[in-house]
A protein has these predicted regions:
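Internal maturation/activation junctions in enzymes
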Residues: 257-325
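Conserved catalytic core of Hanks-type protein kinase domains
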Residues: 254
Length: 325
Protein backbone atom coordinates (compact mmCIF):
# COMPACT_ATOMS: atom_id res chain seq x y z
CA UNK A 1 0.00 0.00 0.00
CA UNK A 2 1.19 3.50 -0.88
CA UNK A 3 -0.71 6.61 0.21
CA UNK A 4 0.13 10.20 -0.76
CA UNK A 5 -1.72 13.34 -1.82
CA UNK A 6 -0.77 12.83 -5.50
CA UNK A 7 -1.64 9.84 -7.73
CA UNK A 8 1.63 10.10 -9.65
CA UNK A 9 3.58 9.87 -6.39
CA UNK A 10 1.52 6.83 -5.42
CA UNK A 11 2.40 5.29 -8.78
CA UNK A 12 6.10 5.98 -8.13
CA UNK A 13 5.93 4.18 -4.80
CA UNK A 14 4.05 1.23 -6.29
CA UNK A 15 6.57 0.97 -9.12
CA UNK A 16 9.37 0.62 -6.59
CA UNK A 17 7.48 -2.07 -4.67
CA UNK A 18 6.94 -3.97 -7.91
CA UNK A 19 10.68 -3.79 -8.58
CA UNK A 20 11.36 -5.55 -5.29
CA UNK A 21 11.81 -2.55 -3.04
CA UNK A 22 10.39 -2.30 0.45
CA UNK A 23 8.55 0.40 2.39
CA UNK A 24 11.68 2.51 2.89
CA UNK A 25 12.46 2.48 -0.84
CA UNK A 26 8.86 3.24 -1.79
CA UNK A 27 8.56 6.07 0.74
CA UNK A 28 11.61 7.86 -0.65
CA UNK A 29 10.48 7.29 -4.23
CA UNK A 30 7.08 8.77 -3.41
CA UNK A 31 8.65 11.72 -1.58
CA UNK A 32 10.87 12.48 -4.56
CA UNK A 33 7.88 12.25 -6.91
CA UNK A 34 5.99 14.68 -4.67
CA UNK A 35 8.97 17.02 -4.97
CA UNK A 36 8.33 17.04 -8.72
CA UNK A 37 4.54 17.16 -8.75
CA UNK A 38 3.84 19.23 -5.62
CA UNK A 39 6.86 21.54 -5.29
CA UNK A 40 4.77 23.99 -3.28
CA UNK A 41 4.46 21.45 -0.47
CA UNK A 42 7.63 19.39 -0.18
CA UNK A 43 11.02 18.78 -1.67
CA UNK A 44 14.69 17.98 -1.48
CA UNK A 45 15.32 21.49 -0.15
CA UNK A 46 13.36 20.73 3.02
CA UNK A 47 13.71 18.23 5.85
CA UNK A 48 12.86 14.56 6.37
CA UNK A 49 11.46 12.81 9.43
CA UNK A 50 10.66 9.11 9.21
CA UNK A 51 9.53 6.22 11.38
CA UNK A 52 10.47 2.72 10.24
CA UNK A 53 9.14 -0.55 11.64
CA UNK A 54 11.45 -3.53 11.22
CA UNK A 55 9.23 -6.62 11.24
CA UNK A 56 12.19 -8.97 11.72
CA UNK A 57 13.19 -7.35 15.02
CA UNK A 58 9.80 -5.79 15.84
CA UNK A 59 11.53 -2.48 16.55
CA UNK A 60 10.74 1.08 15.48
CA UNK A 61 13.47 3.59 14.65
CA UNK A 62 13.12 7.33 14.13
CA UNK A 63 15.11 9.21 11.51
CA UNK A 64 15.79 12.88 12.14
CA UNK A 65 16.72 14.34 8.78
CA UNK A 66 16.27 17.98 9.72
CA UNK A 67 18.91 20.60 9.01
CA UNK A 68 20.39 23.10 11.42
CA UNK A 69 20.63 26.86 11.21
CA UNK A 70 23.88 28.27 9.79
CA UNK A 71 26.77 28.16 12.26
CA UNK A 72 27.28 31.92 12.00
CA UNK A 73 23.64 32.73 12.79
CA UNK A 74 23.90 33.23 16.55
CA UNK A 75 21.65 35.12 18.96
CA UNK A 76 23.97 38.12 19.05
CA UNK A 77 23.67 38.55 15.30
CA UNK A 78 19.88 38.40 15.49
CA UNK A 79 19.81 40.89 18.38
CA UNK A 80 22.08 43.29 16.50
CA UNK A 81 19.67 43.23 13.56
CA UNK A 82 16.53 43.49 15.68
CA UNK A 83 15.37 39.99 14.77
CA UNK A 84 15.81 38.14 18.06
CA UNK A 85 12.09 37.85 18.81
CA UNK A 86 10.69 36.93 15.41
CA UNK A 87 11.85 36.39 11.84
CA UNK A 88 9.69 37.44 8.87
CA UNK A 89 8.41 34.28 7.13
CA UNK A 90 10.46 34.72 3.95
CA UNK A 91 13.60 36.16 5.55
CA UNK A 92 16.83 34.50 4.31
CA UNK A 93 17.78 33.75 7.92
CA UNK A 94 14.91 31.25 8.04
CA UNK A 95 16.77 29.05 5.54
CA UNK A 96 18.38 26.08 7.28
CA UNK A 97 20.53 23.31 5.87
CA UNK A 98 18.24 21.14 3.71
CA UNK A 99 18.21 17.75 5.41
CA UNK A 100 15.86 15.85 3.12
CA UNK A 101 18.48 14.54 0.69
CA UNK A 102 20.61 13.01 3.43
CA UNK A 103 17.48 11.69 5.11
CA UNK A 104 16.36 9.96 1.92
CA UNK A 105 19.80 8.44 1.35
CA UNK A 106 20.21 7.33 4.95
CA UNK A 107 16.76 5.73 5.09
CA UNK A 108 17.41 3.75 1.92
CA UNK A 109 20.93 2.78 3.00
CA UNK A 110 19.87 1.51 6.44
CA UNK A 111 16.50 -0.04 5.69
CA UNK A 112 16.02 -0.20 1.92
CA UNK A 113 16.66 -2.99 -0.55
CA UNK A 114 17.34 -1.00 -3.72
CA UNK A 115 19.93 1.59 -4.75
CA UNK A 116 19.24 5.33 -4.73
CA UNK A 117 19.56 5.25 -8.51
CA UNK A 118 16.66 2.80 -8.71
CA UNK A 119 14.62 4.62 -6.07
CA UNK A 120 14.93 8.01 -7.80
CA UNK A 121 14.15 6.69 -11.29
CA UNK A 122 10.36 7.37 -11.26
CA UNK A 123 10.76 10.94 -9.98
CA UNK A 124 13.57 11.68 -12.43
CA UNK A 125 11.39 10.44 -15.28
CA UNK A 126 8.51 12.67 -14.15
CA UNK A 127 10.78 15.69 -13.95
CA UNK A 128 12.26 15.07 -17.40
CA UNK A 129 9.14 14.04 -19.32
CA UNK A 130 6.66 16.26 -17.50
CA UNK A 131 3.40 15.74 -15.66
CA UNK A 132 -0.09 17.34 -15.65
CA UNK A 133 -0.36 19.89 -12.84
CA UNK A 134 -3.22 19.20 -10.41
CA UNK A 135 -5.78 21.99 -9.75
CA UNK A 136 -4.96 22.54 -6.07
CA UNK A 137 -1.23 22.47 -6.79
CA UNK A 138 -1.75 25.04 -9.55
CA UNK A 139 -3.53 27.32 -7.07
CA UNK A 140 -0.70 27.29 -4.54
CA UNK A 141 1.91 27.42 -7.29
CA UNK A 142 0.36 30.62 -8.58
CA UNK A 143 0.46 32.15 -5.10
CA UNK A 144 4.12 31.25 -4.79
CA UNK A 145 4.92 32.59 -8.24
CA UNK A 146 3.44 35.96 -7.33
CA UNK A 147 5.05 36.18 -3.89
CA UNK A 148 8.45 34.60 -4.41
CA UNK A 149 9.33 33.06 -7.76
CA UNK A 150 9.14 36.32 -9.70
CA UNK A 151 12.15 37.70 -7.83
CA UNK A 152 13.86 34.53 -6.61
CA UNK A 153 17.18 33.47 -8.17
CA UNK A 154 16.37 30.59 -10.50
CA UNK A 155 12.65 31.18 -10.05
CA UNK A 156 12.19 30.98 -13.82
CA UNK A 157 12.83 27.23 -13.62
CA UNK A 158 9.52 26.83 -11.78
CA UNK A 159 7.47 29.04 -14.09
CA UNK A 160 6.29 29.11 -17.68
CA UNK A 161 7.05 32.49 -19.25
CA UNK A 162 7.08 34.04 -15.80
CA UNK A 163 3.83 32.53 -14.57
CA UNK A 164 2.87 29.43 -12.66
CA UNK A 165 1.66 26.44 -14.70
CA UNK A 166 -2.10 26.17 -14.92
CA UNK A 167 -4.15 23.14 -13.93
CA UNK A 168 -3.76 20.45 -16.57
CA UNK A 169 -0.67 21.94 -18.18
CA UNK A 170 2.33 19.66 -18.63
CA UNK A 171 5.30 20.90 -16.63
CA UNK A 172 8.89 19.68 -16.84
CA UNK A 173 11.70 20.37 -14.39
CA UNK A 174 15.00 19.44 -16.05
CA UNK A 175 17.04 21.15 -13.32
CA UNK A 176 15.53 18.97 -10.62
CA UNK A 177 16.04 15.91 -12.82
CA UNK A 178 19.75 16.76 -13.05
CA UNK A 179 19.94 17.07 -9.25
CA UNK A 180 18.26 13.69 -8.81
CA UNK A 181 20.69 12.11 -11.28
CA UNK A 182 23.68 13.48 -9.40
CA UNK A 183 22.36 12.13 -6.11
CA UNK A 184 21.61 8.81 -7.81
CA UNK A 185 25.20 8.61 -9.05
CA UNK A 186 27.09 10.18 -6.15
CA UNK A 187 24.86 9.76 -3.12
CA UNK A 188 24.31 12.47 -0.54
CA UNK A 189 27.90 13.71 -0.93
CA UNK A 190 26.99 14.96 -4.40
CA UNK A 191 24.38 17.22 -2.79
CA UNK A 192 26.23 18.48 0.29
CA UNK A 193 29.63 19.04 -1.32
CA UNK A 194 30.66 20.47 -4.65
CA UNK A 195 28.59 22.27 -7.26
CA UNK A 196 25.13 21.82 -5.72
CA UNK A 197 26.26 22.91 -2.25
CA UNK A 198 28.08 25.88 -3.74
CA UNK A 199 24.96 26.95 -5.64
CA UNK A 200 22.74 26.65 -2.55
CA UNK A 201 25.10 28.69 -0.38
CA UNK A 202 25.63 31.30 -3.08
CA UNK A 203 21.92 31.87 -3.68
CA UNK A 204 21.15 32.16 0.04
CA UNK A 205 24.00 34.61 0.55
CA UNK A 206 22.93 36.70 -2.44
CA UNK A 207 19.51 36.97 -0.80
CA UNK A 208 21.09 38.25 2.43
CA UNK A 209 21.42 34.99 4.32
CA UNK A 210 24.50 33.47 5.93
CA UNK A 211 24.35 29.78 4.97
CA UNK A 212 27.82 28.58 3.95
CA UNK A 213 29.16 25.55 2.12
CA UNK A 214 30.70 24.35 5.39
CA UNK A 215 27.22 24.21 6.92
CA UNK A 216 26.11 21.82 4.20
CA UNK A 217 29.29 19.74 4.28
CA UNK A 218 28.91 19.25 8.03
CA UNK A 219 25.31 18.04 7.89
CA UNK A 220 24.35 14.58 9.12
CA UNK A 221 21.07 12.82 9.84
CA UNK A 222 20.62 11.06 13.16
CA UNK A 223 18.77 7.95 14.28
CA UNK A 224 16.77 8.50 17.46
CA UNK A 225 14.58 6.56 19.85
CA UNK A 226 10.93 7.25 18.95
CA UNK A 227 8.49 8.54 21.55
CA UNK A 228 5.04 7.11 22.19
CA UNK A 229 1.85 7.12 24.18
CA UNK A 230 -1.27 4.98 24.34
CA UNK A 231 -4.73 6.03 23.23
CA UNK A 232 -7.45 3.69 24.49
CA UNK A 233 -4.92 0.82 24.70
CA UNK A 234 -3.47 1.46 21.21
CA UNK A 235 0.18 2.57 21.17
CA UNK A 236 1.09 5.47 18.88
CA UNK A 237 4.66 6.32 17.92
CA UNK A 238 6.22 9.60 16.78
CA UNK A 239 9.64 11.11 16.09
CA UNK A 240 11.04 12.93 19.13
CA UNK A 241 11.81 16.66 19.26
CA UNK A 242 12.92 18.61 17.36
CA UNK A 243 10.21 16.84 15.37
CA UNK A 244 6.70 18.12 15.97
CA UNK A 245 5.13 14.70 16.54
CA UNK A 246 5.02 15.41 20.26
CA UNK A 247 1.98 17.61 19.61
CA UNK A 248 -0.03 14.67 18.26
CA UNK A 249 0.74 12.54 21.31
CA UNK A 250 -0.10 15.35 23.73
CA UNK A 251 -3.38 15.99 21.94
CA UNK A 252 -4.37 12.32 22.05
CA UNK A 253 -3.57 12.11 25.76
CA UNK A 254 -5.85 15.07 26.47
CA UNK A 255 -8.60 13.81 24.18
CA UNK A 256 -8.54 10.33 25.72
CA UNK A 257 -10.33 11.63 28.82
CA UNK A 258 -13.40 12.72 26.85
CA UNK A 259 -16.13 10.33 25.74
CA UNK A 260 -15.96 11.39 22.11
CA UNK A 261 -17.32 8.03 20.91
CA UNK A 262 -20.68 9.14 22.26
CA UNK A 263 -20.63 12.19 19.98
CA UNK A 264 -21.28 12.33 16.26
CA UNK A 265 -17.99 12.59 14.36
CA UNK A 266 -19.05 15.85 12.68
CA UNK A 267 -20.88 17.37 15.63
CA UNK A 268 -19.83 20.81 16.92
CA UNK A 269 -19.39 19.32 20.39
CA UNK A 270 -16.88 16.69 19.26
CA UNK A 271 -15.03 19.06 16.95
CA UNK A 272 -14.77 21.56 19.80
CA UNK A 273 -13.14 18.98 22.09
CA UNK A 274 -10.72 17.87 19.38
CA UNK A 275 -9.77 21.43 18.48
CA UNK A 276 -9.27 22.53 22.08
CA UNK A 277 -7.19 19.44 22.87
CA UNK A 278 -4.90 20.14 19.95
CA UNK A 279 -4.66 23.85 20.76
CA UNK A 280 -3.27 22.95 24.16
CA UNK A 281 -0.96 20.39 22.57
CA UNK A 282 0.35 22.93 20.06
CA UNK A 283 0.92 25.43 22.87
CA UNK A 284 3.10 22.88 24.66
CA UNK A 285 4.93 22.00 21.45
CA UNK A 286 5.68 25.66 20.76
CA UNK A 287 7.14 25.99 24.24
CA UNK A 288 9.10 22.75 24.53
CA UNK A 289 10.11 21.58 21.05
CA UNK A 290 13.64 22.72 20.26
CA UNK A 291 17.05 21.26 19.48
CA UNK A 292 17.39 18.66 22.26
CA UNK A 293 21.15 19.22 22.35
CA UNK A 294 20.50 22.65 23.83
CA UNK A 295 17.03 22.34 25.35
CA UNK A 296 15.77 18.84 26.03
CA UNK A 297 12.02 18.60 26.63
CA UNK A 298 10.85 16.75 29.79
CA UNK A 299 9.22 14.03 27.71
CA UNK A 300 8.32 11.62 30.52
CA UNK A 301 6.42 14.36 32.33
CA UNK A 302 4.77 15.79 29.23
CA UNK A 303 3.57 12.38 28.03
CA UNK A 304 2.25 11.25 31.41
CA UNK A 305 -1.47 10.74 31.87
CA UNK A 306 -1.32 12.96 34.97
CA UNK A 307 -0.08 15.89 32.91
CA UNK A 308 -2.81 15.23 30.34
CA UNK A 309 -5.41 15.39 33.11
CA UNK A 310 -4.07 18.77 34.19
CA UNK A 311 -4.30 20.13 30.66
CA UNK A 312 -7.73 18.57 30.13
CA UNK A 313 -9.15 20.63 32.99
CA UNK A 314 -8.44 23.72 30.90
CA UNK A 315 -10.92 22.59 28.23
CA UNK A 316 -14.37 24.08 28.64
CA UNK A 317 -17.35 22.32 27.09
CA UNK A 318 -18.94 25.54 25.87
CA UNK A 319 -16.19 28.01 25.06
CA UNK A 320 -12.73 28.21 23.52
CA UNK A 321 -9.52 29.09 25.27
CA UNK A 322 -8.54 32.39 23.70
CA UNK A 323 -4.81 31.96 24.12
CA UNK A 324 -3.78 28.59 25.58
CA UNK A 325 -0.37 28.39 27.23
Amino acid sequence: MVATSQPLAVAAGLEILERGGNAADAAVAAAAALNVTEPTSTGIGGDCFALFYDASTQTISALNGSGRAPASLDLQRLEDEGLAQELPPFHPYTVTVPGACAGWCDLVEKHGLLSMAEVLTPATRLAENGFPVAPLTAYFWDRGAQRQLASAPGGHELTIDGRAPRAGEIFTNPGLARTFRRVADGGKKAFYEGEIANAIARVVQEAGGCLEEADLAGHNSSWEQPISTTYRSVRIWECPPNGQGLAALLGLNILEGFDIAALDAASPERLHLEIESMRLAFADARYYVADPVFNAAPLDELLSKDYAAQRRRLVSADRANLDPV
